[in-house]
Swiss-Prot record:
The keyword Phosphoprotein applies. Residues 921-945 have a biased composition (Basic and acidic residues). CDD domains: HP_HAP_like. It comes from the Eukaryota. PANTHER family: DIPHOSPHOINOSITOL PENTAKISPHOSPHATE KINASE, INOSITOL HEXAKISPHOSPHATE AND DIPHOSPHOINOSITOL-PENTAKISPHOSPHATE KINASE 2. Residues 904-945, 1070-1129 are annotated as: Disordered. This is Inositol hexakisphosphate and diphosphoinositol-pentakisphosphate kinase 2. It comes from Mus musculus.
Length: 1129
């Protein structure tokens, strides 16, 4: 078949028969001529055989796939297969090679391609895979050039060619978070590939905001395909292709063509995710066949013809709603698929016969295949199938958030401000390691000058400079965005404050330096998130482990077989991003560092204010609420009936309970203040005690930093006029909760009393700041949550799978009982404000009428008692489908609501509210039906029962089922080939009980023993109709609901935006950038540094930073959200 003729034909795809395995007794009929029986009856002399020669290295020609396929090709009546021996290929001249009519030859390491080309020229056989094109496939530059010429989508790339004799002379500029190659800028994360396709050492570089470092990919060695490295600088020798990193949610698709009309696709876990190769019980890498969409079939057709390779493998990346080709591998076969072996042999045999039969006068007609009939599983009885899981989750345990302000006038600060383009907007946010290192160097230099000369003209406050230095030196490394410095230009200095005399006030320009630190996820928070991820698996079909040997294997199987459409979104705060990554690690049983998981699995969701609140300031409604709240809590008398009415018109039992405990708010604040004074004096005493000199507190904090933290609260809580600043109550509660939980080994006195009182005050202040009356709660909640509500509505509506999702191919799937099933999971990780707001919407937005709905009334009674939405609070929405109901019936789709108030508090919280347990109406354990199957394997039905999403519908199940219960130990059993269980079965163990080991609070790596356990999920409602929920969400999201009816997935929205916005990463991690000593030369700089000559912007501006860099800087800042007491906690 000539190439010109091929190109004119439209792509036409076929697959083989439905029988996924054909035993040798049966498959002769597929390969022999249709009229074989009649032919055999004639006694005419036998026709000449067509000889197919296999010319490749022995490792390839003797591999299992090749043997399987050749065995099948040999069954064609007129075809004989001859395999060239490696000895002959390497050592004999081509004239001595065996003769053949058709040549299948391909390059691999050590193969003499030149000789194969010479042989083809000498003997002129029909060549299956063009040999000259195989030279080009060995160079990625040529591959990319051909792909581009064919109009096939590629990641944005640039080529860096280096002269090996002079590697330094090349067009590469490397920055901290980007490289510039031939004028093309690539922000991290980006990919660096050697130009030689035979070199598999591909590196992916991560941005400093995600922890920096790189993932080093290589040819599989045992169970590893990549390893994480702290090295952040690109390679300095060799030629490379640099390309934009594509966020594929941790999945690669490998496509295998056999001729232009046939392509088999398999998905596997991306080697860049955690570098762990998933293998089955036979030690083979786990891959699952997936369905290509029409665009991808066209790509396969183009690749096959452009490279003139009948048998050809290439890699697809599915990202941003598009499919990109990132590698063409040439001749390669699928491993371990009987169906593919049959199809491949049949197609190759037909190609050979079609081309050569006429020359050999062999009668041949191509057998026609019936179209594949799609497999449509049917169900009987009232069965429900899980279709969608949506969860909104608060971040995990974090360090207390802290802030220090100081006015600076030294020229060095102005120089830094100008260097970083601060004059453009009058504000500057510094959080990159290099920037923080510069601020630290300035602080060290000024302190050294102050130490050497007390009469120095340096105006900066010495104690504040020392605090700046101490905080920046904390942990010995800069890590993501756990610290940041903001500088604001003040043309006339700081405005006068009440304690400042007018005549002392300076009119000269100054900079307001605000140092923020803390608020980062603790090691305990990471454990919490990972454990919750593990527990979360148990909500999916097969989750209880009854048939599986370990809990949650239902989800792992669903996910690994690419029937799970998972997207994880997080707001742009480091603690939230890291919580999301740790949760994903537990949910999907991943291993290794969080940075690669973060970059590939977690999407930033601050577009449209989805999880971040847009406004910097409080809304007018919040201002009114805050003022009223502060007024009530400033009265020095016991709460009156009128106060109860004013503070809790909604009748919240948790708030009433706290008011009973407090009685007189001012007297309680007095007690809290005196307890803080007692605490600071105890810490001072410890600091003076030589035995406590080197004491290390939790997460590298020192006694000095702990004292500063509490001293600042002591100073800020009670104002100069003797009144209390109520907005500091959440901070006090935050700090004491942290110390009781993590620094209990100090055994400070009265900490539990301070915890109890500050919690009672916080239990009033925090929830009531989101509104006192129901109308206010709803108004404030809408301000925070409307974009999120719209997105949730769109998630529930999109019950039809789109073609960009990885779908399992039903015909090729062995041992997967329900290949058509697809479950969508959307996880939204955010801060406290969104969780409070979403819960307010559910409670007060009129979803159900509690006077008519008994189940909703019970749920509202339970929520009334919940006093805190702690770390890892979850609101979970689950959508089920009943395939037996008519598509237009309201009963077709069914929604459930579940809720957990998150982590349990400290020891004394014995009276946690308890609901009615986790009672999904569609419990698979209830009334489970036995499956009748025709499968020959007797154990299959039991094994695959795990894999069913069909569950019996029962409105109420009385027994509470906690997803955090301790699971039984896995029972011993043979794991079948298709189950995805890594040989390091680290998640086969019983989940770690999230801790109540209080006996020895300091034991364990990073104090694992202090990770608080998480309250189990409670069912709020398990019998809602989708229409009812949709109408409710539409009413909340109005007036612009209709515009967002077709909200696309965030990934596709990102595609349409500029390339710079395609992947916005603003993350945090524990991969350190080491803090450097200040260079001696800088310390010797003259003391004549002038005080403050910078009256305005200088003419010499720093180079213009790229818009991408600017967007990262501006968006990732934790802008003092809401200047309020409880926001973004």
């Amino acid at each position: 078949m000539s190439n010109s003729r091929k190109m004119s034909e439209p792509p036409r795809f076929f697959v083989g028969p439905e029988d996924a395995e054909i035993n040798p007794g049966n498959y002769r009929r597929f390969f022999h001529h249709a009229e074989e029986e009649e032919e055999e009856e004639d006694e005419s002399p036998p026709e000449r055989q067509i000889v197919v020669g296999i010319c490749s290295m022995a490792k390839k020609s003797k591999s299992k796939p090749m043997k399987e396929i050749l065995e099948r090709i040999s069954l064609f009546k007129y075809i004989t297969v001859v395999v060239f021996e490696e000895e002959i290929i390497l050592n004999e001249p081509v004239e001595n090679w065996p003769l053949c009519d058709c040549l299948i030859s391909f390059h691999s390491k050590g193969f003499p391609l030149d000789k194969a080309v010479a042989y083809a020229k000498l003997r002129n056989p029909f060549v299956i895979n063009d040999l000259n094109m195989q030279y080009l496939i060995q160079d990625r530059r040529d591959v990319y050039s051909i792909l581009q010429a064919e109009g096939i989508l590629l990641p944005r790339y640039a080529i860096l060619n280096r002269d090996p004799n002079n590697p330094k002379e090349c067009n590469l500029i490397e920055g901290e978070d980007h490289v510039e190659v031939n004028g093309e800028v690539f922000q991290k994360p980006f990919v660096e590939k050697p130009v030689s396709a035979e070199d598999h050492n591909v590196y992916i570089y991560y941005p400093t905001s995600a922890g920096g470092g790189s993932q080093r990919l290589f040819r599989k060695i045992g169970s590893r395909s990549s390893v994480y490295s702290p090295e952040s600088n690109v390679r300095k020798t060799g030629s490379y292709i640099y390309e934009e990193f594509m966020p594929t949610d941790g999945t690669d698709v490998k496509v295998y063509t056999v001729g232009p009309d046939y392509a088999h696709a398999e998905a596997r876990k991306s080697p860049a995710l955690d570098g762990k190769v998933e293998r089955d019980s036979e030690g083979k890498e786990v891959r699952y066949p997936v369905i290509l969409n029409a665009r991808e079939k066209l790509i396969a057709w183009k690749v096959c013809l452009a490279f003139k390779q009948t048998v050809c493998g290439f890699d697809l990346l599915r990202a941003n709603g598009q499919s990109y080709v990132c590698d063409v591998n040439g001749f390669s076969f699928v491993k371990n698929s009987m169906k593919y072996y049959d199809d491949c042999a049949k197609i190759l045999g037909n190609i050979v016969m079609r081309e050569l039969a006429p020359q050999f006068h062999i009668p041949w007609s191509i057998p026609l295949e019936a179209e594949d009939i799609p497999i449509v599983p049917t169900t009987s009885g009232t069965m429900m199938e899980l279709r969608c899981v949506i969860a909104v989750i608060r971040h995990g345990d974090r360090t207390p958030k802290q802030k220090m302000k100081m006015e600076v006038r030294h020229q060095k600060f102005f120089d830094l401000f100008e260097k970083c383009d601060g004059y453009k907007s009058g504000k500057l946010k510094l959080k990159k390691p290099k920037q923080l290192q510069e601020v630290l160097d300035i602080a060290r230099q000024l302190l050294m000058e102050l130490g050497q000369n007390n009469d120095s003209e340096i105006e900066e406050n010495k104690s504040k400079l020392e605090q700046l230095k101490t905080v920046l030196e904390m942990y010995g490394h800069f890590s993501g965005i756990n610290r940041k410095v903001q500088l604001t230009y003040l043309p006339h200095g700081c405005p006068k404050t009440s304690s400042e005399e007018e005549d002392n006030r300076r009119e000269e320009p100054s900079l307001l330096l605000v140092l923020k630190w803390g608020g980062e996820l603790t090691p305990a928070g990471r454990v919490q998130a990972e454990e919750l991820g593990r527990a979360f698996r148990c909500m999916y079909p097969g989750g209880q482990g009854d048939y599986a040997g370990f809990p949650g294997c239902g989800l792992l199987r669903l996910h690994s077989t690419y029937r799970h459409d998972l997207k994880i979104y997080a707001s742009d705060e480091g603690r939230v991003q890291m919580t999301a990554a740790a949760f994903a690690k537990g949910l999907l049983a991943l291993e290794g560092e969080l940075t690669p998981i973060l970059v590939q699995m977690v999407k930033s969701a601050n577009m449209n204010g989805l999880l971040d609140s847009d406004s910097d300031s409080l809304s007018s409604c919040q201002q009114r609420v805050k003022a009223r709240l502060h007024e009530i809590l400033q009265k020095d008398r016991d709460f009156t009936a009128e106060d109860y009415e004013k503070l809790t018109p909604s009748g919240s039992i948790s708030v009433i309970k706290s008011m009973h405990l407090i009685k007189n708010p001012v007297k309680t604040c007095d007690k809290v203040y005196s307890l803080i004074q007692s605490l600071t004096s105890q810490i001072r005493y410890r600091m003076e005690d030589p035995k406590s000199a080197d004491i290390q507190l939790y997460h590298s904090e020192t006694l000095e930093l702990m004292l500063r933290r509490w001293s600042k609260l002591e100073k800020d809580f009670k104002t100069k006029n003797g009144r209390y600043d109520i907005s500091k109550i959440p901070d006090i509660y935050d700090c004491i909760k942290y110390d009781v939980q993590h620094n209990g080994s100090l055994k400070l006195e009265n900490t539990m009393e301070l915890y109890r009182l500050s919690k009672a005050l916080a239990d009033i202040v925090i929830p009531q700041e989101y509104g006192i009356t129901k109308a206010e709660k709803l108004e404030i909640a809408k301000g925070y949550c409307t974009p999120l509500v719209r997105k949730i509505r769109s998630d529930l509506q999109r019950t039809q799978d789109d073609d960009t999702v990885n779908k399992l191919h039903p015909v090729y799937s062995r041992g997967v009982l329900s290949p058509e099933r697809h479950v969508r999971t959307r996880l939204y990780f955010t801060s406290e404000s969104h969780v409070h707001s979403l819960l307010s919407i559910l409670r007060y937005g009129a979803l159900c009428d509690d006077s008519k709905d008994e189940q909703w009334k019970r749920a509202m009674d339970y929520l009334n008692v919940v006093n805190e939405l702690n770390y890892m609070t979850q609101i979970v929405i689950m959508l089920y489908e009943d395939p037996n109901k008519d598509l237009s019936s309201e009963e077709r789709f069914h929604v459930e609501l579940h809720f957990s108030p998150g982590a349990k508090g400290c020891e004394e919280d014995k009276n946690l509210p308890s609901g009615y347990g986790y009672r999904p109406a569609s419990r698979e354990n209830e009334g489970r039906r036995s499956l009748k199957t025709d499968d020959d394997e007797p154990h299959t039905s039991k094994r695959d029962e795990v894999d069913r999403a069909v569950m019996l519908f029962k409105p109420l199940v009385s027994e509470p089922i906690h997803i955090h219960r301790k699971s039984p130990l896995p029972r011993s059993r043979k794991i079948t080939a298709n189950e995805v269980v890594s040989e390091n079965a680290n998640y086969l163990r019983t989940p770690r009980n999230l801790v109540e080991q209080k006996q020895n609070p300091t034991v364990g790596f990073e104090l694992y023993s202090m990770v608080p356990s998480i309250c189990p999920l409670e069912t709020l409602h398990n019998a809602l109709f989708l229409k009812q929920v949709d109408d409710f969400l539409a009413s909340i999201a109005s007036p612009s609901t209709e515009v967002l009816r077709k909200v696309p997935e965030m990934s596709s929205m990102a595609t349409r935006s500029s390339p710079g916005m395609r992947r916005k990463i603003s993350l945090n991690t524990y991969t350190p950038t080491k803090i450097l000593p200040t260079p001696p030369a800088a310390l010797k700089s003259s003391k004549a540094s002038s005080k403050a000559a910078a009256g305005g912007p200088s003419q010499a501006m720093a180079p213009h930073t790229s818009s991408r860099k600017k967007s990262i800087n501006s968006k990732t800042e934790g802008h003092e959200p809401k200047k309020s007491t409880g926001k973004k906690r």
